[in-house]
Amino acid sequence: MEMTMRWFGSNADKVELSEIAQVPGVKGVVGMIMDIPAGEVWPKERIKALKEEIEAAGLSLKVIESVNIHDDIKIGLPTRDKYIENYKETIRNLAEFGIEVICYNFMPVFDWLKSDLDYRLADNSQTMAFVAEDIPENPQEIIDRVQAADGGFSLPGWEPERLSEVKDLFEAYKNVDEHKLRENFAYFLKAIIPTCEEVGIKMAVHPDDPPYPMFGLPRVVKNREDLDWICNVVDSPSNAITLCTGSIAEDPANNVYEIMAEFVKRDRIPFAHVRNIKFLPSGEKDFYEAPHMSEYGSLDMYKILKAMYDNGFDGYIRPDHGRMIWGETGRPGYGLYDRALGASYLNGLWEALEKNKQ
């Protein structure tokens, strides 16, 4: 297991690489290039510069999150083949610089959804929350709300240039139901996985967040059955999963422990996001993102990591969203301090699992 932390780049992240390098046990960075629009090829020189910058700080770059998928691919438009070829070229370029895993999602319009990016806990720390009754019927209202609370940073999956076209996007997706989205996903995977096999990269899909339909948009990465379907569409180790414990567990019907154990054992989880959530009494699926420690949330983090360890997990892991604590400000979910605490906690659990096995 290699502990990492997500970093958005020197021009897009308040957290410095030198600060990440000081977090005990963190060996690498999960990187991205924020300003390349979906559908465009990632130039080799940009990838090379990112890798060199990260390695100069004493950290590794083995995972990219994310190479966003153009909506024409998800919708199934005739232009999708052009964007798929661009995606394949990006895969080759990333592999040339030692990238092993690409995390991505296949969600229409919104890459993730929360009702509140500034949810206050009893200790006055700030976190993100999802309360169903607080989600407006008009998607433009949630866009305005998110952009007003983004801390001055572009949020992944909520890039302003893309969301400025949200009305057109909803119109484009109006005839895309779950069956059609699944067909388009299969088309994409069958096209790119041979390239991944050729260059040694694992494409690792992130579960839908939340894992159920919103605004009438379909979801196809929402439960154990969907993950099994994805793995079987192209039966290859290169066709993999980024298991996000918080996202998959947002639906209480999903048994995150069993799902983690099964797909680690099947060697389909090269990368994991590990976070805790706390369900609220206001609704069955209402929750806030809790501190990583088990006692603060609804998930048993030891049980999650034990499922990973016992089934041979040897991939990359990162603490997922953290609270804003100790007066820190910045991109919601991605401050330094609480994620550093989360990384240390997860590393401690892993050390205990290793030593208990000896």
Curated annotation (Swiss-Prot):
Which cofactor names does the annotation list? Fe(2+); Mn(2+)
What catalytic activity does the UniProt entry give for this protein? D-mannonate = 2-dehydro-3-deoxy-D-gluconate + H2O
Q: Which pathway does this polypeptide act in?
A: Carbohydrate metabolism; pentose and glucuronate interconversion
Q: Does the keyword Hydrolase apply?
A: no
**A Pfam family the protein falls into:** UxuA
Q: Does the keyword Lyase apply?
A: yes
Q: Name one GO molecular function term.
A: manganese ion binding
Q: What EC designation does it have?
A: 4.2.1.8
Q: Name one GO biological process term.
A: D-glucuronate catabolic process
Q: Write out the entry's keywords from A to Z.
A: Iron, Lyase, Manganese
Q: Which leading EC class covers this enzyme?
A: lyase
Q: What does this protein do?
A: Catalyzes the dehydration of D-mannonate.
Q: Which family does it belong to?
A: Belongs to the mannonate dehydratase family.
- Mind telling me what this protein is named? Mannonate dehydratase
Annotated organism of origin: Lactococcus lactis subsp. cremoris (strain MG1363)
